[in-house]
Structure formats: structure tokens, C-alpha cells
Amino acid sequence: MRIGIIAALPGELKPLVRGWTKVPVARGSGIAMWQRERDGDELVAVCAGMGAAAARRAFTAAEFAGSLDTVLTVGWAGALTGDVRPGECYAASEIIDAQTGERFALPVSRRLRLVTTVQVADEREKRRLADSYGAALVDMEAAAVARLAQIRGIPVHCFKAVSDSVGARLPDLNPFLDIDGKLKMAAFLAHVAVRPQFWGALGQLGRNSAGGAKTLAATIEEFLVEGLRK
């Protein structure tokens, strides 16, 4: 079985792929890929940036050596309610594309909706999304991965670790994302360097993200061992 694990950023996958084989990719592609064989299964983890276009590139890269039998869309997500806690990992039962209205049902017993948007959601937008969709989490990639899985007729599973709470007051990241879904780090750091009101929240975001990536890795490992063949 070939299992694709699609994320946006290397940091989301770092604890999971420790010890995996790094797969060479075209220079300048913006894609990072790792591979591992386990119990007769081939696992391939890929990230290519934030947003739907980057998720599609990552999915295509995962298929380069052969078609996938199942796919996982994983990574960090923002909280839309206080019911999901930063640093914890959750399995979505439904993915909603806020742009198209499409809904993708997933095989999870606990009801938990995730909504995918085209931009990073700020505090105000988070509350609107929670009210409009009854969702608990927001990301930028899951719907694109779910759509590609549906087209191919393969199962999709969604695991997201919460990086920021519903009330987190973070700087607007959207102006600092390039066309490939990568953060323009130098420009972003220059922006926040003179805005100390964001320093505490960004520090908390970093801690939540690091802890969440570890929890995400443990959740994925457990799923691959116990949940995949149920």
C-alpha cells in the first residue's frame, strides 16, 4: 500500500519524518519529500507550501513514484472555538471548502468540522467561520487534498494540530505569503520587529506549533499502526 501524507510546511512533518529517507526533488521546486518503508507499506510525506495550489503540487509529487492507495492531509490549523486546544491534535469528520461550498465526509465517529479558506484567518474571520459553518478548525489545504482523493476514488483522512487559539491576536500573515505559499521570512521579521504587541503571541504560536507537531506525529503513527486497516 502507498500512503501519501500531505502537509504545508516542513515544521509540521519534522517529528514524524525523523529518520526517514529524504527524497531528491528538482532544485527550486519548493517541495520537500521523505519516504519510508514499513510493514510492507510505502509511506511518502510531502510539503510544498501553504494553500490549495501548493497542496496540489504536493499531492502530485507524492504520486510521482506510483499512485496512492490512501492519503492523509495533516499539519497545523487554527482554532475556531474554545473546544479545541492549542498543541492538541484532532481528526476531522468533515472538511468544508469555504470558497466552493463543497463538503467532504471522513470516516471519523466524533463530529468535528474543519473549514478550508484561501487566506490565513484572523480573529474576526475565525469567529465568522465558526458561526457560518459550525466548524472547530480552519486551514488552507485540506479541501484541495480531499478533492484530489475523491477524484481518484481513494480514502482521505485529516489530522490537524492546533497552532493558535480562537482569540490569538497575530499579525496578518497574508501580505507575506508568496505565490508558492511560502512565507517571506525576512520581510515578515522586519514587520514584527517594530511591533512588540505581537511578540508574546508569536512566541506562544511557536510553542504551540512545536508541541502540536509532536502530537501530530504521534497521532499519525498510531493511526498507521491501529486505525488504517479498520
Q: Which positions does each model-derived feature cover?
A:
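Alpha-helix boundary/capping residues
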Residues: W20-V23, A62
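N-terminal beta1-alpha1 ligand-phosphate binding loop
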Residues: R2-T21
